[in-house]
Amino acid sequence: MARIGDGGDLLKCSFCGKSQKQVKKLIAGPGVYICDECIDLCNEIIEEELAETSEVRWEELPKPREIYEFLEGYVVGQEAAKKALSVAVYNHYKRVQAGENGGGQSREDAIELAKSNILLLGPTGSGKTLLAQTLARMLNVPFAIADATALTEAGYVGEDVENILLKLIQAADYDVKKAETGIIYIDEIDKVARKSENPSITRDVSGEGVQQALLKILEGTTASVPPQGGRKHPHQEFIQIDTTNVLFIVGGAFAGLEKLIESRAGAKGIGFGATIRSKRELESKDQFEDVMPEDLVKFGMIPEFIGRLPVITSVHNLDREALLQILVEPRNALVKQYQRLFELDGVELDFEREALEAIADQAILRQTGARGLRAIMEEVLMSVMYEVPSRKDVARVVITADVVHSNVNPTLIPRDARGRGPGEQKTA
């Protein structure tokens, strides 16, 4: 058996060009050589590709209770919505699993399971988008967010509905097979309600027209998607994607829908036997809890569209206590994020309870919900985030209620003469 280098020639790796003296091992093939470093690199590339193309492992599909508990770690409150989403998502991917495995039934006996697309009602900043994002993160499936207000019917200025699918394909790194089991969240769907309950004789290209265009992809169809987005034209290739197993979560604030619900419920509650509720009871109750498909049709959604969203659930306005929990309790809570940012500069950041209450009150006053908390935190911490990184004498920053209410400077606690902060112990 011939040994490498017997002829006296200095052999090199055919891939990186390094000589046998520069590497640990040089493996010979028919007319080629590869070094141990190139082998390691090839293994890393293969592992990355396998990780990227890994699909949901259906045999390990989490149960509804496990999905709910995962959501609990990121989303505060909204128990009813989390429970409904957990069940709907589990049933959807169980349906996908049954479709891939044949469900253990012959083709003649097979029962076709319908899709469980979800309609999520609730005010802005109440956690609709976060719920959808968290579900996708747990299941390790591609996730895309689309804004319904940018969509128009095909042939008019604006985005075609197929561009929603392109975002999902891009999220899956153009792995169409993987994208076909992803989740799409369409926000602001209430903004495409038709102008009146009755069908219009004029073209409503950004309202009813969008709902009509969404029907097919919601139900399940093979759509042709332009790979670069934009409008379709005959001289381009298309990506074919089957939306049968794509889960659609459709959300919107539906401002004014509560009045339609009240008027319907009020018509049934007239007379001596009617249940009378105080204003306080009505405010504390989830305003969309009693929603019916007929209310959504009166709001301006077409019946065919509502029919393709069998799971209807809602999130409610966040009160002060819920906002306080959002600030400190979730795994990626805002207070924890800012404390980590200051920690990277070697500084502790503390919030007094009254300061957190003041931040929550500001969010309620601005009617921005949880989404507005970060903006308020940025305003409160802007001056100290500008000042502290340049100062080596600051050990701790304390945020009080006056900092939030009156825009006074935060309390800066200096280090001692040896450079220790007040909470640091002397080491032997």
Curated annotation (Swiss-Prot):
Q: Where does Zn(2+) bind?
A: C13, C16, C35, C38
GO BP = cell division; proteolysis involved in protein catabolic process
Taxonomic classification: Bacteria, Bacillati, Actinomycetota, Actinomycetes, Kitasatosporales
Q: Pfam families in the record, alphabetically?
A: AAA_2, ClpB_D2-small, zf-C4_ClpX
* Binding residues annotated for ATP, in chain numbering: P123, T124, G125, S126, G127, K128, T129, L130
The UniProt function text for this chain reads: ATP-dependent specificity component of the Clp protease. It directs the protease to specific substrates. Can perform chaperone functions in the absence of ClpP.
User: Per the database record, which ranges form the ClpX-type ZB domain?
Assistant: 1-54
* Organism name: Streptomyces avermitilis (strain ATCC 31267 / DSM 46492 / JCM 5070 / NBRC 14893 / NCIMB 12804 / NRRL 8165 / MA-4680)
In the record, the note on similarity to other proteins reads: Belongs to the ClpX chaperone family.
Q: Name one GO molecular function term.
A: ATP hydrolysis activity
What highest taxon heads this organism's lineage?
Bacteria
**Keyword Nucleotide-binding assigned:** yes
This protein's encoding gene = clpX
User: InterPro entries in the record, alphabetically?
Assistant: AAA+_ATPase (IPR003593), ATP-dep_Clp_protease_ClpX (IPR050052), ATPase_AAA_core (IPR003959), Clp_ATPase_C (IPR019489), Clp_protease_ATP-bd_su_ClpX (IPR004487), ClpX_bact (IPR046425), P-loop_NTPase (IPR027417), Znf_CppX_C4 (IPR010603)
Q: Name one GO cellular component term.
A: HslUV protease complex
UniProt keyword annotations, A-Z: ATP-binding, Chaperone, Metal-binding, Nucleotide-binding, Zinc
Name the PANTHER family on file.
ATP-DEPENDENT CLP PROTEASE ATP-BINDING SUBUNIT CLPX-LIKE, MITOCHONDRIAL (PTHR48102:SF7), ATP-DEPENDENT CLP PROTEASE ATP-BINDING SUBUNIT CLPX-LIKE, MITOCHONDRIAL-RELATED (PTHR48102)
Q: What is this protein called?
A: ATP-dependent Clp protease ATP-binding subunit ClpX
What does the record note on quaternary structure? Component of the ClpX-ClpP complex. Forms a hexameric ring that, in the presence of ATP, binds to fourteen ClpP subunits assembled into a disk-like structure with a central cavity, resembling the structure of eukaryotic proteasomes.
